[in-house]
Amino acid sequence: MLKNKILATTLSVSLLAPLANPLLENAKAANDTEDIGKGSDIEIIKRTEDKTSNKWGVTQNIQFDFVKDTKYNKDALILKMQGFISSRTTYYNYKKTNHVKAMRWPFQYNIGLKTNDKYVSLINYLPKNKIESTNVSQTLGYNIGGNFQSAPSLGGNGSFNYSKSISYTQQNYVSEVEQQNSKSVLWGVKANSFATESGQKSAFDSDLFVGYKPHSKDPRDYFVPDSELPPLVQSGFNPSFIATVSHEKGSSDTSEFEITYGRNMDVTHAIKRSTHYGNSYLDGHRVHNAFVNRNYTVKYEVNWKTHEIKVKGQN
């Protein structure tokens, strides 16, 4: 049921002249070897690993790009974290009541990378700052000698010998780094604000997503239709994040990395109430972070010599 894909590509980059057209990640996968320029000062060796959990509603697609640079005194690895995190939005009767319906939905998506290897250090990552735009596009570039730099957009990579880009959509959500140190980085993609028929609403509004049909028996009808829900609530999130790590040459042959995808869930209650005149309406009540860290974590073993990737465990 689970498929592992391995893509090996060796790329050569000349030290003598920078690339006029830098190598991008979408080089044809059919080519096992691609030579860029003259000489072989840099080799980029690529691996890809896919893991899916039906239990958690998550697919991890991880690209491992080994950077072998004769002008850099360390090993380097670029990890691009892609895949899909299902929203797991659910509608149900609250504690078998007839007048209270519940909507469980993702207030936050979690993406994280961690290692405990003393010879490994996190040296760069994307995105870095809080990003509120709907469409996120950034590039991480590498120049010979261990120089990693980031560019703000997909078009800002002209001076790099090698580059890796991220691009994702986060309508009504914002991205920010929640934790970061030399061994780990954790991002949160959090609900922000929503345009509704009654105006702009904060992600913390108690009436957010509460609908207009208090006489229905179907819990789904107590909340707004799918056409009024953003994709990250209705369907899910396609992450695209990058982390770059260095490894001390001549130390350990292997290192382990834990990569986590998941979500924190809020619950909105739609409560049927009546006015003094007997008219029914729906009143919202909110439970923030009702279910947190509903995460799928996979432990990957990286071999710095053979460039093999092994899955060592998952929850």
UniProtKB/Swiss-Prot annotation:
Q: Which GO terms describe its molecular function?
A: toxin activity
Please give the InterPro entries that the UniProt record associates with this protein. Bi-component_toxin_staph, Leukocidin/Hemolysin_toxin, Leukocidin/porin_MspA_sf
Output the Gene Ontology cellular-component terms: extracellular region
Sorted alphabetically, the Gene Ontology BP terms of this entry are: cytolysis in another organism
Q: Where is the signal peptide?
A: 1-29
| Listed SUPFAM superfamilies | Leukocidin-like
The protein's UniProt keywords, in alphabetical order, are:
Cytolysis, Hemolysis, Signal, Toxin, Virulence
Keyword Membrane listed:
no
Q: Please describe what this protein does.
A: Leukocidin causes cytotoxic changes in polymorphonuclear leukocytes.
Q: Which family does it belong to?
A: Belongs to the aerolysin family.
Subunit structure of this chain's protein: Leukocidin consists of two protein components: F and S.
User: What protein is this chain from?
Assistant: Leukocidin-S subunit
Q: Which organism is it from?
A: Staphylococcus aureus
Gene for this protein? lukS
